Structure formats: C-alpha cells, structure tokens
C-alpha cells in the first residue's frame, strides 16, 4: 500500500513540476521570440525606435530563461525559436503582434515585465 501511495505522489509531484508552460504557452512564447528577433533585425529605414530593439532582445532572453526554469530543455527551446525566427525574419514591424507579445510576457511569466526592464538595463 505504501508503495502505491509513493508512486501516486511521485506522479503528481512530477506533473506539477512541469506544469509551468503548456504546449500552447510554448508555441506562443516561440512565436513571440520569432517576432522579437525579427524586430531586432529590421532593415534600415523601417520605423522602429532603438529602445524597442533593446526591449525585444531582453524579452527573448526573459522568455528563454523562464522556459529553462520550468523544465524545457535548451535544445527543444532553441529548435522552436529557430522555426519562429525563420517564419518572421525579414518581415516588417508589426506593432500589434509586438504589443500582444509584451502582454503575454507580463501575464504568463511571474514579474515578466519587470524582468524585461531589468535585462534592458544590463544591455548598456
């Protein structure tokens, strides 16, 4: 009986430990990483403030750090980001998508907006 209780508790604890980012959340985070990377590499002449490039790079770092913290392997994360970057690289700045990504970070990562601000400050 103790063995079964231990197995059930172990299973529950394991599932709770990996509950930080669902597949849907991962997809959104990868899409946002692709959008942010595209923002950073916008061609010259595109209307875009330099501070937004910094915020984009900081956001990518915060998303990756959080993903690794909740148990996503670096290899899996990088593969997802690379696909998203391929999808968005060379596209024009999309303010709506970028703002949606800011909201995703603020709402799905504990202290996400503050973490982005902190990383931006370290870029100088």
Where are the regions that the model predicts?
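Sec-dependent N-terminal signal peptides
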Residues: 4-14
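Short N-proximal segments of mature Sec-exported proteins
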Residues: 22-72
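Compact alpha-helical subdomains of small soluble proteins
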Residues: 51-124
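Boundary at the C-terminal end of the N-terminal hydrophobic targeting segment
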Residues: 17-19
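Residues embedded in well-ordered secondary-structure elements
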Residues: 21-22, 90
């Amino acid at each position: 009986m103790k063995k079964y209780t231990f197995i059930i508790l172990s299973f529950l604890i394991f599932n709770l430990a990996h509950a930080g980012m669902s597949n849907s959340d991962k997809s959104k985070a990868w899409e946002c990483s692709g959008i942010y990377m595209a923002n950073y590499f916008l061609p010259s002449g595109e209307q875009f403030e330099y501070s937004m490039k910094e915020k984009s790079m900081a956001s990518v770092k915060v998303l990756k750090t959080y993903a690794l913290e909740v148990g996503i392997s670096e290899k899996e994360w990088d593969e997802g980001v690379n696909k998203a970057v391929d999808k968005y690289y060379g596209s024009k700045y999309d303010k709506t998508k970028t703002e949606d990504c800011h909201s995703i970070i603020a709402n799905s990562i504990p202290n996400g907006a503050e973490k982005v601000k902190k990383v931006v400050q370290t870029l100088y």
